[in-house]
Amino acid sequence: MSEPQPQLEIPTRAPAATSADDTILPFQVEALDLRGRVVRFGPAIDTILSRHNYPVPVAKLLGEAIVLTVLLGSTLKFEGRFILQTQSDGPVRMLVIDYTTPGKVRACARFDAARVAAAMAAGAAAPGTLLGHGHLAMTIDQGPDTARYQGIVALEGKDLEHAAHEYFLRSEQIPTRVRLAVAEELRAEIDGARHHWRAGGLLLQFLPQSPERARQPDLDPGDVPEGMEFQPQPEDDAWVQGRSLVATVEDLELLDPDVSAEQLLYRLFHEPGVRVFRSRDLHAQCSCSRAGVERMLRSFPQDDRDHMVENGKITVTCEFCNSTYVFAPMDVREPEPSQPDPG
């Protein structure tokens, strides 16, 4: 799938007055060989996180993982699914996020409630602490008859931004910076004030076109002869400028509904000039269905299905969207094989 054609260029066009929620906005800074994405989440992420009664730190961590998944998945030129999954020894054992092109998202978390409560009581519920040590896997699934591609990076007690930087540094050799922000917004409504989740993110990558620009400083090979020192190639000035600008982005700028993505990009890159492309919409949408759950149940041996019966019915709850499907045991029983006609 080819990169969309430019829709507008800043600063030749006035930025949008307000933020467009639930969108992905690609951009390019040609003068510095930089490309990236800005993601703004409003109702979609509120829908996903509000479906579950997660503790606030768990919901915030899952929100960050959702933003990271969309930032990474939307850079790939394919039709299919991008899945981000963590498995670790921290209080939050697993995060699973599905991004299906062009913009459907679902997500869930598994966690130890007692350990999360203890971490919150001790004031030690930072994302890196909740994750602990383990790994983060990113899988590209383009559908039947295609091979899956998977990239893995270690989780080392640090946050998801750090994990993303390490992955691109060591696996893709692409200088990358990621900023993630998630928070609750207190909003007045007819029946009283209510908390709503908001999230935002920024991805910036250095993809030089000119040969004189170094793409990535060399990593220490670990086998430098004794008596010699490894001399890494210095970072390109364009990348130093880009990552330094991203480091100035505050959480509020990624979350504020009164600051559009275009305004944020203009603030960061108005001197070299920034071009934005057509935005894409994001939706909270699960792929589960009654028919799909029924097929899944029929795939189990009959003995397993018999053990699923409670109070005369089989109940299945989707971990992603919390939808519940109830079946009578006979609904998912395989038909008895027909007997041959004795005549």
Which residues does each predicted region cover?
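Polar low-complexity intrinsically disordered regions
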Residues: M1-Q7, P337-P342
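Cys/His-clustered metal-coordination modules, chiefly Zn-binding fingers
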Residues: R243-G343
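Interaction interfaces in information-processing and related assembly proteins
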Residues: E3-R278
